[in-house]
């Protein structure tokens, strides 16, 4: 999939236009404070482009998973339909104001914002409240999603999509609005995301390594199946590695294992061999008897995990082996951590992979792509994110791209003639 044949924000006049931009400001908030503003910062180039060209921005996003209310529900005496304090975009408006160094107005109800929109002048920014406060945003009933899309579309002259993180959703704000307006344009973040993934999937510098981790093989079946026809090396870590290792007859102690996926693991390993893909699995492990942080976890001498122990991270020999493979590759794509990186004593494997990719990018020109979600969080936590070619803002969307699927939020955008 590529954005080469889709129109972008550079292909349309923005002066004096009210531009409705679907962004992904689904950021972590604790006690009313944003703990990671990466997604907000990633949307700035598109917002600044509109302002520079003399347009005004109407921003819409979701945050969290509020229960939501229907458009037809009675309006409460105070407040707005579906409102939940934990999911308000108020902290986002404050942070965006700081980043833009100008006031960002906020409409408290995304579907009753006409008065706020009418006051917009050149260079103004308006943030609508959480679109998921209305259940129509994610409704599977086309008429419900269309009803919400029509209200939002009425605010604007143009629709721009910069929400790669929700591009895999067929929703009112991702596909409904461009359908109503008859056009939709890609923002700079959307364009950047798709083009990086397109490059690594369709025409990567070789050798190409896929580093795949996380808890379950079942979560990565389609990704692995699609990538085996494209990669030279497959590096496996995380809890999912132990399903593969048990399938090979190794001892895994009480490590997590999907017993019903052992035959699938064998099949994937056989397919990799048939396609000439070298698969690397852990050769030593950092273990504990319980799923908790300890000061001195057990590090095994070899590939087998002792009885009564569970593997929580890859060991030093495995780290060295994985670093060597990354070092000999020209492209690397990483989806899923190597272990429980949130616990400092068992974060070394994940952080070592991040360091190897960052170093390879800066010193040897490695094309390095981080596939969003937990992997992006790990790269940020390891302070290596800035060294990568690209850190995706989308977990589910990047996973579906790697699985070879078409993203509805991209497919709906206007084709170039």
Curated annotation (Swiss-Prot):
Q: In which pathway does it act?
A: Carbohydrate degradation; glycolysis; pyruvate from D-glyceraldehyde 3-phosphate: step 2/5
Primary location recorded for the protein, binned into one broad class: cytoplasm
Which residue ranges traverse the bilayer?
none
- Source gene? PGKB
| Recorded family membership | Belongs to the phosphoglycerate kinase family.
Q: Does the record carry Lyase as a key word?
A: no
So which cofactors does this thing need? Mg(2+)
Enzyme Commission code: 2.7.2.3
Binding positions for CDP?
Answer: 214, 219, 238, 336, 341
Binding positions for ADP per the UniProt entry = 214-215, 220, 238, 311, 335, 341-342, 374-375
Question: Under the GO molecular function aspect, what terms does this record hold?
Answer: ADP binding; ATP binding; metal ion binding; phosphoglycerate kinase activity
Q: Specify the protein name.
A: Phosphoglycerate kinase, cytosolic
| InterPro entries tied to this protein | Pgk_euglenozoa, Phosphoglycerate_kinase, Phosphoglycerate_kinase_CS, Phosphoglycerate_kinase_N, Phosphoglycerate_kinase_sf
